[in-house]
């Protein structure tokens, strides 16, 4: 079973009528076998759909139009089995609005040395057919992924899957709706941004709603549904006897369950995939949602605190991209440092860290929330599982959006955190905290990020290229002088590219 149900990537092979019916039959047969191999492979998480070989400008244009209008198609893989004169592709590529990958492969891995003849050479021409196609992509300035190697190679299939996941994320971005309850935290700069520009570039819509509308949805939840929700909490988390045995704590938990159910209903009925709220805008609420927000994220919704709609969007997009993979994705904040032999960052937030990143079964507890509405709020407590991760931040620079990515190594805390009443993750940024933090600050990265152990750097690279967005990467090879020069060069490139 593929991780992405209903979503598809189309496999389109290019050729021409020059070769005659026998060669074209072989081209079609080989293409079908490749598609079958991809669909049988556990390495590729999305269904690949075979499309008949295209041999003329009219056929190419028609299949590109069909891909555009098919809601289930998130992108296309293009392969030139033989030589397919690239002028035939101009109208189709001009029409194509879905992302495309150029797969530079051939059907047979090895040459049949003792049998090879000109019939074989004319049938298996990817080596120069794909170069012809590559030229027209470059000439038309088309952004695309190029994957090179034999189609059965595990490395090639991993690259294909990375791109397919990015294409699924881009498809989600094009259809995503984000609900904002309240506004940004007052006087905060980085969570602001141009929502119209974001919709033009990324596709997602951001809509504001009053707390009154949300409170109506919460008030409409039946008490029987609240009781059933408490039963779910008891079965899914570590819950101390004192919580259900204490009348006051139980009341706070019932209120939180009601918030979760009301929020879920509001978002689902409105077709929203992500939401934001702010601790400064809680009129009529019993508190800042804690457990409710954590569970909504665990169920796939994106979230951004303090009105941070850009991070909410990225959390949702990355959750879609990571479907079926180990690890999780969460809203996150760089909170405090541990300077020592190896400098570390303790990431957390006031309440809202997703349990999909938890190292062990979370504990459900009620603690005092001291910012905004000061009250006792149920929340899940845990530490993040150890392993490689990334932090991704999207910022608005005025004339463009920039995505900043830092590769991390999440580690197990050396000691317990018995007095910390929020979920957290401890990580060591690559190459180290001194370089990573300086680079992040030079790039303008936010204090919020989308943290993930399910998504790879390559997938974010593919996504950023689909979006036409600037991406800067902080990893083990980062050096500050080179990084600052990259930022300067990017400023020139993206400034000129808008007018070219």
From Swiss-Prot:
Native organism: Shewanella sp. (strain MR-7)
Gene Ontology molecular-function annotations: L-arabinose isomerase activity; manganese ion binding
Membrane-spanning parts: none
Comment on bound cofactor: Binds 1 Mn(2+) ion per subunit.
Residues holding Mn(2+): 306, 333, 349, 448
Necessary cofactors: Mn(2+)
Protein's UniProt name: L-arabinose isomerase
Keyword Manganese: yes
NCBIfam families in the cross-refs: PRK02929.1
EC number annotated for this UniProt entry: 5.3.1.4
Any one Gene Ontology BP term: L-arabinose catabolic process to xylulose 5-phosphate
Pathway the protein takes part in: Carbohydrate degradation; L-arabinose degradation via L-ribulose; D-xylulose 5-phosphate from L-arabinose (bacterial route): step 1/3
């Amino acid at each position: 079973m593929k991780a992405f149900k209903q979503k598809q990537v189309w496999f389109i092979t290019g050729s021409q009528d020059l070769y005659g019916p026998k060669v074209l039959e072989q081209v079609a047969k080989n293409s079908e076998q490749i598609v079958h191999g991809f669909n049988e492979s556990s390495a590729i998480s999305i269904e690949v759909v075979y499309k008949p070989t295209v041999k003329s400008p009219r056929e190419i244009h028609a299949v590109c139009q069909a891909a555009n209008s098919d809601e289930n198609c998130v992108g296309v893989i293009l392969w030139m089995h033989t030589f397919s004169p690239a002028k035939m592709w101009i109208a189709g590529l001009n029409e194509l609005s879905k992302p495309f990958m150029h797969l530079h492969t051939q059907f047979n891995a090895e040459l049949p040395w003792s049998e090879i003849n000109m019939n074989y050479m004319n049938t298996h021409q990817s080596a120069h057919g794909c170069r012809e196609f590559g030229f027209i992509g470059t000439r038309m300035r088309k952004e695309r992924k190029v994957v090179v190697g034999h189609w059965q190679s595990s490395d090639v299939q991993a690259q294909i899957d990375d791109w397919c996941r990015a294409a699924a994320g881009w498809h989600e971005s094009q259809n995503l709706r984000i609900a904002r309850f309240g506004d940004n935290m007052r006087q905060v700069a980085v969570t602001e941004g141009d929502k119209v520009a974001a919709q033009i570039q990324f596709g997602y819509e951001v809509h504001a709603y009053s707390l009154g509308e949300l409170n109506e949805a919460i008030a409409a939840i039946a008490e029987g549904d609240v009781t059933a929700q408490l039963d779910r909490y008891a079965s899914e988390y570590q819950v101390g006897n004192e919580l259900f045995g204490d009348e006051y704590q139980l009341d706070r938990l019932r209120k939180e369950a009601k918030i979760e159910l009301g929020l879920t209903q509001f978002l689902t009925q409105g077709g929203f995939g992500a939401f934001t709220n702010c601790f400064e805008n809680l009129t009529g609420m019993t508190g800042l949602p804690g457990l409710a927000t954590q569970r909504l994220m665990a169920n796939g919704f994106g979230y951004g605190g303090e009105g941070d709609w850009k991070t909410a969007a990225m959390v949702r997009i990355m959750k879609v991209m990571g479907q079926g993979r180990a690890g999780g994705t969460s809203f996150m904040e760089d909170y405090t440092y541990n300077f020592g032999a190896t400098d570390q960052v303790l990431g957390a937030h006031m309440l809202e860290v997703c349990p999909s990143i938890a190292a062990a079964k979370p504990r459900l507890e009620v603690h005092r929330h001291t910012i905004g509405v000061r009250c006792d709020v149920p929340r899940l407590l845990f530490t993040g599982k150890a392993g490689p991760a990334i932090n991704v931040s999207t910022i608005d620079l005025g004339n463009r959006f920039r995505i900043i990515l830092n590769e991390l190594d999440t580690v197990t805390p050396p000691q317990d955190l018995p007095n910390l009443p929020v979920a957290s993750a401890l990580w060591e940024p690559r190459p180290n905290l001194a370089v990573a933090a300086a680079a992040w600050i030079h790039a303008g990265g936010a204090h919020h990020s989308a943290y993930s152990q399910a998504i790879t750097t390559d997938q974010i690279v593919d996504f950023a290229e689909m979006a036409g967005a600037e991406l800067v990467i902080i990893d083990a090879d980062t050096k500050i002088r080179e990084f600052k020069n990259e930022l300067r060069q990017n400023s020139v490139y993206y400034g000129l590219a808008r007018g070219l």
